Design a protein with these regions (language model features):
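Bacterial Sec-dependent N-terminal signal peptides
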Residues: 1-26
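Mature catalytic domains of secreted/periplasmic carbohydrate-active enzymes
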Residues: 25-520
């Protein structure tokens, strides 16, 4: 092997850096209009390759139900629902919310013990950024980060834009600590923002009155319950916090929750142009995820909460989901690793990615059940990652009896899906390599009908088939009824099973130079 001499290596690095700098300078800055922003590569390759990310819902509101059976109480929305007394802030049934009842018993009337007092009790002794990042990496995630600001207007970083932050109340900067540890693991860093809804979130608090004007920087300025029009101060504060996080932490991805679609188009365009231009300045491809109609699929990445399309989409998309509640909830029921792996496989087959939530304990430690779940997912991905990471949709996404009856938000809540061993999902690595993922353990032979010699979906000869994680020789035959794979003696995992299908490659006949071949 010929070693590169030091001057040559230095010259190579110099040329590479200068080339990258020139390329970044040659790209036109984005302007605050849709036409300009549509020139962005809204789904960079790193995002399309990643397939799996993690964020964590943790903050002062996590302590609201500590030691209590929450039943149907809202956790993350406690700062809003705690003021719903059924009278001043009515409900259709005329009764107070479960949150109001619980809060009154635990803390006293919310007019006397408001949300700001919950913030003042924020406990962070269990938070360990290195442990979080180690676990995220073990799970197989390729990007991760905190919920930087939820509906409660509380900054999970050392903010100068708001005094309501984790350094002033908690003594830590989780965003800085997580960025350092997450990037040290080779993962991309993200932050999520939910504070567009803050205007509606704290409207019930204002209905009760008595808020000290000096605390309007938390609760927003007084406004009516039915107000959907934030004032100028709200827009100024919303942008200042978001801009500060971008400037200080240089995230690879910004994810937005709903209600941003109700803010002005001007404010949304201002963000997109600023953040994408920052990406040019940092010389890295950044990404934005959104819900509803906030942006367009040519300017950012569409997200589906606890849902997904029932067919593949041309543009990459994202599902944000949680194995249990979004925030800590005692006694919460969690999805199994098997369920989450199946959801991930179905998502990836349709050109999507999964953003999985982790709900830490109130003190910032991660529950053992969540840790076990993530390690199990990581073990599956360690074996089957070739069928997930860096793949693209095949010509069809799958076959089998189990399909989503509809696509969109919250379909996971509407329909209980249990995939069977006759459900197959496909992913593609290249023109000569794709994967058939069997969603449950086969009992006998596996028949993939899509690959029948009669259908014509596959226009290449199969060279070999392998089961990921196994050294066993796989026996197979392609017939009129489909690709028939004999079940191996043992499977390397307990969940979905990925078969690598290696192809000869598509070739076309050439006419050649024989004159006779060209005669009609």
């Amino acid at each position: 092997m010929r070693l590169i001499k030091r001057p040559s290596l230095f010259l190579f690095i110099l040329v590479f850096c200068v080339s990258n700098y020139i390329n970044s300078q040659n790209r036109e800055p984005f302007k605050e209009n849709w036409k300009s922003i549509e020139a962005v590569n809204q789904a960079p390759d790193w995002f399309k390759d990643a397939k799996f990310g993690i964020y964590a819902h943790w903050g002062p509101v996590s302590s609201a139900f500590e030691g209590a059976d929450p039943d149907k109480w809202y956790a993350g929305w406690h700062g809003m629902k705690m003021y719903v007394d059924g009278k001043i802030v009515p409900q259709p049934n005329g009764k107070p919310s479960n949150n109001f009842v619980h809060h009154s018993k635990k803390y006293g009337h919310p007019k006397d013990f408001g949300y700001k007092h919950i913030i003042e009790q924020f406990e962070t002794t269990g938070f360990d950024a290195k442990k979080w990042a180690d676990l995220f990496a073990k799970s197989g995630a390729k990007f991760a980060g905190p919920v930087a600001m939820h509906h409660d207007n509380f900054a999970m970083w050392d903010s100068k834009a708001t005094r309501w932050n984790s350094m002033n109340y908690g003594g830590i900067d989780p965003s800085a600590a997580l960025k350092k540890e997450i990037e040290a693991k080779g993962l991309k860093f993200m932050g999520s923002f939910h504070h567009a809804f803050t205007w509606k979130y704290f409207a019930p608090a204002h209905a009760h009155g008595g808020i000290d004007p000096k605390d309007y920087d938390l609760y927003t300025n007084p406004h009516a319950l039915d107000s959907d029009t934030p004032d100028a101060q709200f827009y100024e504060d919303w942008w200042a916090k978001l801009k500060e996080f971008i400037d200080v932490y240089q995230p690879d991805l910004i994810w937005f929750d709903w209600w941003l679609e109700n803010m002005t188009e001007e404010s949304r365009l201002k963000f997109l142009a600023y953040y994408y231009n920052k990406g040019l300045e940092w010389n890295k491809d950044v990404a934005v995820c959104y819900k509803e109609t906030t942006f367009t699929e040519t300017t950012a990445i569409k997200d589906y909460e606890r849902g997904r399309p029932n067919q593949p989409k041309e543009n990459p998309w994202l599902t944000d989901t949680s194995p249990g509640a979004w925030f800590y909830r005692p006694g919460a029921q969690f999805k199994s690793p098997n369920e989450l792996v199946d959801i991930l496989v179905d998502i990836v087959s349709k050109n999507g990615l999964m953003l999985l939530n982790v709900p830490p304990n109130p003190d910032g430690s991660i529950p053992q059940v969540m840790e076990d779940l993530l390690i199990d997912m990581g073990a599956w991905l360690n074996i089957n990652g070739d069928a997930i990471y860096g793949t693209r949709p095949w010509i069809v996404f799958g076959e089998g009896p189990t399909r989503l009856p509809e696509g969109g938000h919250k379909v996971e809540d509407k329909v209980k899906i249990a995939y069977k061993n006759t459900d197959i999902r496909f992913t593609k690595k290249s023109d000569k390599e794709f994967f058939a993922i069997v969603m449950d353990k086969p009992e006998n032979e596996i028949v993939i009908k899509t690959l029948s010699t009669e259908i014509g979906a596959l226009n290449s000869r199969i060279l070999k088939i392998e089961l990921l994680g196994s050294n066993e020789t796989i026996k197979w035959e392609r017939t009129k009824k489909g690709l028939v794979i004999q079940s191996p003696k043992a499977f390397p995992t307990d969940y979905a099973h990925a078969f690598r299908i290696v192809l000869e490659g598509y070739t076309e006949n050439n006419i050649g130079g024989d004159v006779g071949a060209h005669e009609d």
